[in-house]
């Protein structure tokens, strides 16, 4: 459950370490975002020499949330942290590596490149 002002870890090698959500995309009254939803964020912490700089505005897709997500079979999935992957405007990841597990819901939302780069899909 991500909303405005939520801080997320970045699970790719773009150079960003932490981002802050400034908008949840998908309608003017949309408040919360879950796994597979796209947000607009600003980079709060970045490593030197990375592709993105601190203060840059980016689009990102959420890959892990602490809040549990219900699946069609009745099971729930949750993670230890909130994490996102920075994407381009065509929903392709900006980085070349993904760190940590990602949820299976990304495959249903057509983020195939992120799913294929991830070391583990849960």
From Swiss-Prot:
Keywords: Ribonucleoprotein, Ribosomal protein, RNA-binding, rRNA-binding. GO terms for biological process: translation. Gene3D superfamilies: Ribosomal protein L14. Signal peptide: none annotated. One of its GO terms (molecular function) is large ribosomal subunit rRNA binding. GO terms for cellular component: cytosolic large ribosomal subunit. The keyword rRNA-binding applies. It comes from the Bacteria. Coiled coil: none annotated. InterPro entries: Ribosomal_uL14 (IPR000218), Ribosomal_uL14_bac-type (IPR005745), Ribosomal_uL14_CS (IPR019972), Ribosomal_uL14_sf (IPR036853). Binds to 23S rRNA. Forms part of two intersubunit bridges in the 70S ribosome. This is Large ribosomal subunit protein uL14.
């Amino acid at each position: 459950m991500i909303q405005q002002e939520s801080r997320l870890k970045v699970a790719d090698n773009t150079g960003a370490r932490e981002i802050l959500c400034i908008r949840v995309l998908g309608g003017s009254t949309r408040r919360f975002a879950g796994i597979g939803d796209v947000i607009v964020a600003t980079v709060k912490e970045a490593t030197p020499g990375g592709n993105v700089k601190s203060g840059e505005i980016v689009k990102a897709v959420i890959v892990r949330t602490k809040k549990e997500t219900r699946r069609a079979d009745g099971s729930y999935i949750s993670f230890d942290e909130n994490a996102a992957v920075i994407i381009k405007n065509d929903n392709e990841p900006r980085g070349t590596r993904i760190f940590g597990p990602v949820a299976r819901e990304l495959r249903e939302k057509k983020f195939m490149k992120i799913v294929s780069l991830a070391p583990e899909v849960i």
